Amino acid sequence: MDPYKYCPSSSFNTPHTTTNGGHPVYNDNSSLTVGTRGPVLLEDYQLIDKLAHFTRERIPERVVHARGATAKGFFEVTHDVSHLTCADFLRAPGVQTPLIVRFSTVIHERGSPETLRDPRGFAVKFYTREGNFDIVGNNFPVFFIRDAIKFPDVIHAFKPNPKSHIQESWRILDFCSHFPESLLTFAWFYDDVGIPQDYRHMEGFGVHSYTLINKAGKVNYVKFHWKPTCGVKCLMEDEAVRIGGTNHSHATQDLYDSIAAGNYPEWKLYFQIMDPDQEDRFDFDPLDTTKIWPEDIIPLIPVGRMVLNKNIDNFFAENEMLAFSPHMIVPGINFSNDKMLQTRIFAYGDTQRHRLGPNYLLLPVNAPKCAYHNNHYDGFMNFMHRDEEVDYFPSKYDPTRHAERHPIPNAVITGRRDRRVIEKEDNFKQAGDRYRSWAPDRQERFLRRWVDALSDPRLTLEIRSIWVSYWSQADKSFGQKLASRLNVRPTM
């Protein structure tokens, strides 16, 4: 018998209802009782099975990015980048690759309004011929911290107070006051882009520095940028309050309705490329996630376009069970020594195993669309039918062999084991540059948001003074305005 012929699927529905075991159900409206009013019998397995499944329908919520919307489409190469990478899906202009994208808010719970000030997730899974490739990014190009040992702490600070379950700005600003590298990310967070109008009008960034390797073995650092062809649009606070008060799923609905109407959203993918031999030329560390690579020095290189032209068929199967991880790379693309990236490689796969189980990569939305083979057997919810007798490698009885070798970074790394901060911190220059690039009205809105946040009565004078000092080092004029509005002096 074909083991896959009768796998559960909506295409194999019966004309009548059944139990999960396939038994016909002649009455799904009444429990089995003794008489018309008697007690319900424990032997009513139809009822027990239905209730037991219902009470287990929910799975653990994502610890971050719980609220999300998903769509499917394709990526098409539009420019030749084969001199930069040997990645098969980027081999030539015109090559198309199917993909799925998940947009999300970061901090708030599943079901929370999509109008809250919060970073947005921008995660893309490419189903390539060499396996899946995930770019797990955000709508900000930088992050609040540079070392992932503080990641649980920064998320705890942004999450609701464990006592009251209320998100409070004093907790955020207290924690981040110890980390001046967060200043540049706050220059996005409290900027207009802190509340995107919807997902279609939102940029995406890979945040981390990866490496590209070409066929000759040449390695370059790379950053990924997604630019929406319909432009970037944001919500002001009054608009966010009005929209969020009537539709807490406005961004999800906008994405779904646009695709259903044939108005397919599109983004252009760009690379920023840096030769590792040149990284010491800069006054910042290129592998620091709290820094951008200035585009006037390292310009954007066009690569291709992403088009989302199909809505998902089932929210749970293609959104809740969808799993991304930065460790999903393909030949021609590799990691850098970015501290945040190095630890996310472990953390994301680990949280998926907790949330979905050890066989989460067997779920259809996560499984590669190419042929694959390994000796990962058994485990909870392993529904793959396998009939091999050899479950080890190597073997004289199994022709499986190693894949053809592909180029990987081979830089020699030396150093002393230690817990240290990076040498080039430069925590203030880029934040000041960003602020000075804005028009006066945008600067005023940014100032007002900082004043509102720092006016939280739980914040001490010391913490307010620290932030005034940080911004005074980034831009003297802004620091003076902030100090004047708050009636405080900087501590530095």
From Swiss-Prot:
The active site is at H65, N138. One of its GO terms (molecular function) is metal ion binding. It catalyses: 2 H2O2 = O2 + 2 H2O. One of its GO terms (biological process) is response to hydrogen peroxide. Heme binds at Y348. InterPro entries: Catalase, Catalase_AS, Catalase_clade1/3, Catalase_core, Catalase_haem_BS, Catalase_immune_responsive, Catalase_sf. It is found in: Cytoplasm, Cytosol; Peroxisome matrix. Residues 8-25 have a biased composition (Polar residues). This is Catalase. It comes from Avicennia marina.
